[in-house]
Amino acid sequence: MWIGVISLFPEMFRAITDFGVTGRAVKNGLLNVQYWSPRDFTYDRHRTVDDRPYGGGPGMLMMVQPLRDAIHAAKAAAGEGARVIYLSPQGRKLDQQGVRQLATNQKMILVCGRYEGIDERVIKTEIDEEWSIGDYVLSGGELPAMTLIDSVARFIPGVLGHQASAEEDSFADGLLDCPHFTRPEILESMDVPAVLLSGNHAEIRRWRLKQSLGRTWLRRPELLKSLALTDEQTRLLAEFQREYQSEQQEY
């Protein structure tokens, strides 16, 4: 996958390209990240990249000419088929379904805003999609862009040690993930659930699914409303709810 990044601070993306899963993906040639800074497309000695908004008000906007020139340079490098994405609080909220959708692209250009944002006409003429990572404000689009790259890269074949890892992540099937345990078997008088030590793969799968359903019901119940549960899932959720309510009564 090829990703172009438009940013005033491209060095921030070393967190993606030099470390962890995404760093290995870059090293192994599975992920290619290139950068264009609007500062490199300025023509004044101060390398100005911000400008005052029409109508007044606090803050500045990114200057149109350097930003557009940077986007055009990235488009030329990408060739045909690259989607241009602006990271913005006004965009569609990124979720696992959206990540899967974005992962089908072989080429993306991510535009990271700064200051109070970018000119609306640039959005209309240069941007294909707007995406947000949540209903809050950050200082720029770099962190959302890194979040998007990390989440999408997990779906590139060969990036994860076991491709099933991406399929079993939280939200992969619309549910939160189940609890996980590793050694030691007993930690401060707390045991690993016996079923996980049984070697019975059918029962382990059933337990994990029930815990996933139950955890979603407890922590993110709104997610269940958008799902069409199977008969098995409905039974397991009801079973979890009975067990949970029984435990609460004991306390």
UniProtKB/Swiss-Prot annotation:
GO MF annotations, alphabetized: tRNA (guanine(37)-N1)-methyltransferase activity
Chief location of this protein within or outside the cell: cytoplasm
EC number: 2.1.1.228
Keywords: Cytoplasm, Methyltransferase, S-adenosyl-L-methionine, Transferase, tRNA processing
One Pfam family recorded for the sequence: tRNA_m1G_MT
Cellular compartments annotated: Cytoplasm
GO cellular component, one term: cytosol
Reaction it catalyzes: guanosine(37) in tRNA + S-adenosyl-L-methionine = N(1)-methylguanosine(37) in tRNA + S-adenosyl-L-homocysteine + H(+)
Entry binding sites for S-adenosyl-L-methionine: G113, I133, G134, D135, Y136, V137, L138
Superkingdom of the source species: Bacteria
GO biological-process terms attached to the record: tRNA N1-guanine methylation
Top EC group: transferase
Record's function text: Specifically methylates guanosine-37 in various tRNAs.
Family: Belongs to the RNA methyltransferase TrmD family.
NCBIfam families, A to Z: PRK00026.1, trmD
Quaternary context: Homodimer.
HAMAP family in the cross-refs: TrmD
The protein, known as: tRNA (guanine-N(1)-)-methyltransferase
Species of the source: Pectobacterium atrosepticum (strain SCRI 1043 / ATCC BAA-672) (Erwinia carotovora subsp. atroseptica)
